[in-house]
């Protein structure tokens, strides 16, 4: 596997010798979020902050360097001990710098792309328009990933290879292989050690159909497979396989607004894992009123070894300007131990020429 990784990187570098040099182009983006959380049942509060900086630098023909780093800071801790997660920007540990991506991307024509380097699963697979509206962590990456594997989901990164192929218009094939253990420690991120860390692979087939509205109809089926260290004995590598799917189906138009059905689910082939399965369903309406607000409701349910959890989220995203937005959200959580209601208020600032 190590030889394959080195070989693909060498192929990317070799492509420069056969391509004409182009003037570098630099794209950048900066995202800052601050979020207040309030557990209305027990009165606990928390303040969460997130900063993300990304850059894309054009190199030779068809090639670019992609980089992204984040900083996280929170005060008050988690407002409850649920596994689904109320916030997709919350991290337990405060860190001023986490490198999430540092990779080389090479396109071969308009239909085949290869990226090699430090990467993140969330950015590669889970950034669709409908799921991206919601604040819950389960909509940012599926619980069967973050709870069953020590892989590169927020806020971690891992060395890997990511492939994308578009054989026909609307159809996208993706496949990735990552180091089996991800990290946010700079000294451990740039390692590919299948013998000790194992490997993790994920892939999917997606098909999009254009519609009259802003968002296309999208259908995705994917798999996950990992041979990663056991949670009981880190020296033992265990094989775990699962499957996941995502549906984003526009239902109707109301003026310029579009009503979209969201459906997602995942299941593991083994039952003796932390998270055996997950499903979610909801509705999203975009381009509401003059400032193009987006509103949605979603219900997420997780089958966890210690007990099932269900989270119902209602949220609305309001643009105040082209770069400033506010988003309140309400979560009603049915926990295997207790129930609670929590509110979030998120303010976001987005700048850059590559948004």
Specify the residue positions occupied by each region the protein language model found.
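Transmembrane beta-strand segments of Gram-negative outer membrane beta-barrel proteins
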Residues: 21-39, 63-67, 136-137, 143, ...
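Repeated loop/turn-to-beta-strand initiation elements of outer-membrane beta-barrel proteins
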Residues: 26-28, 62-65, 111-114, 169-175, ...
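Outer-membrane beta-barrel pore domains and translocons
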Residues: 31-37, 70-72, 119-121, 178-180, ...
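Residues that define the transmembrane beta-barrel architecture of outer-membrane proteins
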Residues: 36-38, 45-51, 96-100, 155-159, ...
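Outer membrane beta-barrel
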Residues: 52, 56-180, 273-282, 286-288, ...
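Residues on the lipid-exposed face of transmembrane beta-strands in outer-membrane beta-barrel proteins
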Residues: 53-57, 102-106, 161-165, 203-209, ...
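Detector for outer-membrane/organellar transmembrane beta-barrel domains
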Residues: 207-303, 314
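Outer-membrane beta-barrel "beta-signal"
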Residues: 339-355
């Amino acid at each position: 596997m190590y030889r394959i990784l080195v070989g693909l990187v060498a192929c990317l570098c070799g492509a420069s010798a056969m391509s004409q040099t182009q003037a570098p182009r630099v794209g950048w983006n900066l995202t800052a979020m601050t979020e207040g959380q309030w557990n209305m049942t027990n009165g606990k509060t928390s303040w969460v902050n997130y900063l993300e900086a990304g850059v894309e630098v054009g190199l030779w023909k068809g090639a670019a360097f992609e980089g992204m780093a984040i900083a996280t800071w929170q005060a008050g801790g988690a407002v409850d001990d649920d596994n689904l997660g109320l916030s997709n920007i919350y991290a337990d540990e405060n860190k001023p710098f986490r490198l999430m991506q540092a990779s080389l991307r090479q396109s071969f024509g308009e239909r085949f792309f290869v990226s090699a380097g430090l990467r993140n699963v969330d950015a590669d697979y889970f950034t669709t328009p409908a799921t991206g509206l919601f604040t819950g962590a389960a909509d940012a990456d599926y619980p069967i990933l973050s709870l069953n594997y020590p892989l590169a989901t927020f806020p971690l990164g891992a060395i890997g290879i990511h492939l994308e192929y578009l054989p026909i218009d609307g159809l996208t094939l993706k496949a990735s292989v990552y180091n089996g253990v991800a990290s946010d420690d700079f000294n451990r991120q740039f390692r590919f050690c299948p013998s000790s860390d194992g490997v993790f692979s994920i892939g999917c087939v997606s098909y999009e159909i254009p519609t009259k509205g802003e968002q296309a109809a999208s259908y995705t089926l994917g798999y996950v497979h990992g041979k990663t260290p056991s949670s009981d004995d880190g020296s033992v590598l265990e094989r775990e396989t699962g499957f996941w799917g995502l549906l984003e189906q526009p239902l109707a138009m109301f003026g310029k607004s579009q009503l979209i059905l969201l459906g997602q689910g995942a299941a593991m082939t083994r039952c003796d894992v932390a998270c055996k399965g997950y499903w979610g369903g909801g509705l999203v309406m975009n381009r509401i009123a003059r400032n193009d607000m987006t509103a949605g409701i979603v219900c997420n349910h997780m089958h966890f070894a210690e007990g099932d959890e269900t989270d119902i989220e209602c949220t609305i995203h309001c643009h105040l300007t082209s770069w400033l937005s506010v988003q309140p959200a309400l979560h009603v959580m049915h926990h295997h131990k207790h129930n609670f209601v929590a509110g979030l208020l998120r303010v976001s600032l987005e700048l850059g020429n590559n948004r």
